[in-house]
Amino acid sequence: MTIKPVSQERLPELLRTIPKAELHIHIEGSLEPELMFALAQRNGVSIPYPDVASLRAAYVFDNLQSFLDIYHAGTLVLRTEQDFYDMTHAYLARAAADNVLHAEIFFDPQTHTAHGVSADVVINGLYRACVDARVEFDMNASLILCFLRHLSEQEAFECLEQALPHLDKLVGVGLASSEMGHPPEKFARVFARARELGLRLVAHAGEEGPPAYIWSALDVLKVERIDHGVQAVQDPLLMARLARDRIALTVCPLSNLKLRVFPTLAAHNLGRLLEAGIVATVNSDDPSYFGGYINQNFTQTFAALGLTAQHAYQLAHNSFEASFIDDRLKRQYFDRLAGVFETFE
């Protein structure tokens, strides 16, 4: 579809208006300090910050591991099914306001089972919020269980076993947490089992890790989509493979900036990925920690890189193409997207 030009003044409004899917959102990373405090009080959990302001000030980190440390500390307040419902509902309300029509939500049950919270409690709370979003926000949402790669293969198998009663509530599995020193092939057998169970497969690769991790995720884990993947540009053969096979990258620009994957947003390679014909998408990753939900990722990245309305259409189209929804719903979303561009002035 050829897109008519939109002025720089009107472009932010277009970016806010376009329908889109979000495919890389860790629900625990959407926990805002205000809700964290409320849940801590509700559950009698002590947190080492006297007020919301001091907690916000603690959201300062310069690499993936230091972020993960505060991220996991924040999850201690999540104890009941209602807590997980409230957190997910808050994200879905915010996403709906950003014109997200479909979200595929990551969650990591191992974080919570380590705190004595059962996988049943986690999944039921998340799923109930997704079901309610269909009526309340006219929004589709599904769940992707993420294994934590710094833990063992055996622990990942145990996590999958605990989720078996809830397979109907899950669309897929993923692989998250600190990448360095934890190559994808560590989890080859777990992903093979998940595939046998009919789950879709994705994995974080090539965020801080090398292009070799992306190759492994594709060829050993057999994933259908790569989360992050920005290091692919180091490998021309990999770039060609991603473009040829329409393998999507769920890119998270503000996350990359916050974790210093790129020194500035202007140095980000999103534009280069699109020019190479790769199915790149824009996502928020852990929005409460990285300073931006999906529309802030769009508006700030477009401003920094000088991207255009044509790029906006391509990224939104890519997000629906790369999603795990059925073809009928994809066509509906493609039509809605085209309609916005046809009528936007």
UniProtKB/Swiss-Prot annotation:
It comes from Albidiferax ferrireducens (strain ATCC BAA-621 / DSM 15236 / T118). One of its GO terms (biological process) is nucleotide metabolic process. The active site is at 207 (proton donor). It catalyses: adenine + H2O + H(+) = hypoxanthine + NH4(+). This is Adenine deaminase. Its cofactor is Zn(2+). Its EC number is 3.5.4.2. Disulfide bonds: none annotated. One of its GO terms (cellular component) is cytosol.
